[in-house]
C-alpha cells in the first residue's frame, strides 16, 4: 500500500517541534498521511524558501512563514491562494474564530488569503513577579527611588527598575534583550522603541523617518541599556530571541520584552527554573507626549508551498491544524495559538497566565511595512542596530547611513516616484 506523505518546513523552535509532532500524529491517525517535518534556522529558512524559491520546486508542501516575508512570497507566487479551498471546506469557525489582527497580514493586495495564522507573538513585557512583590525589595526600591516598586509604565521607570535589580555579583541583571544581528528581534526591538515614542519608520509619502528624534532616542536607549546603564549583560549581543527566552527562564533576569511564547517557556518546569514566578503586561511607553504602549503584530502562518504536488492533502492538514483542539495543542506545547478560543481557554490561562493579556496587547499593535521590499529594508535596519550596539558607529551616524540606504531602496522600487507623480 502506498503511503501518502506531506513535507512541512518550519523555523527551528522547540515549541514548533513539539506542537507539529502532536498535530502530525493526529493527522496520520485521522487520514493515514505521514507529515514529514524539517526545522531550519530562521535566516536559512528565508534564504531557502523565499530568496532561493524552494517553495516552487516541489520539495515541500507546507511552509510555516513569518508575516514579514509574505508580501515578497505573494508577489513571487511562492504560496498558493487558499480561497477556493476555504470556500469548499472552511476551517472551524472561519473567520470569526480569529481576531482581525490574526487575519489581515496573510491577505494579499489581490484580496486572496495565503495562509492561516499558526503561531502568534505578540511581544509582551515579561517580568519576575516574585521579585516585584518581595516586601524587602519593595522597601529598598522605594527608599532609593522615592516611589513604589511596580511594573514600569514608562521607559524611564524601566531603567530605574533595571538598575535596582542589577547585581552582577549575584549574577542578577535588571533586563535582557535579544540583540544578535539576525534581522529578527534586534530590528523589532528598535521598531518597538521607535513606535512607543511616537516615531514612524517612513512618512506617508515614503520618506525615511526613523532617523529623526524618536529614532535617535530609541536606538540610543538600546545602546545605553548595555553600555551606559549596564543593566543588560553583554552576552545579550550574541542572543537571538530563542536564546534570550531560555536564558530568562533560568533565572537571574528581572525583566524583558519578548515574544509571549517565551513567557510560556518560563512556565514549563522541564525548561524553566522559575515556573510560577512570571507575569506579563504592557510594554512600557516613551516618557514624552508621543509616548504610547505598543507591540509588534508579527505572526507565523501555515501556508501551502506553490510547488506542492498535493495541495488538497496539504490543505486538509492545514485545516485540521487550525481547529480549536489543535490550536490549543500549539499553545500547550510552548507555542502561541491564534484562535480566540485558545486565548480565552481556562486550562491554557492557568498554565500560561499571559494569555489573560493577549487580547489587550492586540489593541495597540503595528507591523513592519507590508511591501515586498521590506526584507531588504529589514537587513539595513539589522546592520544599523548592530553597528550601534557594537559601538562601531555613533547612533546618529548609524541612523543617517541606514536612512540613506532605505531611501535608495524605496526610490529604486518606485515608491517615491509614484507618490511624486
Q: At which residue positions do the language-model features occur?
A:
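Conserved N-terminal structural module of periplasmic/extracytoplasmic solute-binding proteins
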Residues: 1-76, 90-95, 136-140, 289, ...
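Extracytoplasmic/periplasmic substrate-binding proteins
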Residues: 23, 187-192, 196-197, 219-310, ...
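Short helix-initiation/N-cap motifs at beta->coil->alpha
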Residues: 40-48, 153-157, 235-249
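A structural signal for short loop-to-beta-strand junctions that line the ligand-binding cleft
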Residues: 51, 58-61, 91-132, 290-294, ...
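Hinge/lid segment of periplasmic solute-binding proteins
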Residues: 67-124, 186, 279-283, 350
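Helix-loop-helix "hinge/cap" segment bordering the ligand-binding cleft or interdomain interface
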Residues: 86-87, 107-186, 199-235, 306, ...
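Periplasmic-binding protein-like
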Residues: 170, 228, 318-340
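Long, aromatic- and glycine/proline-rich binding clefts that accommodate carbohydrate-like moieties
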Residues: 276-285, 331-383, 387, 412-421
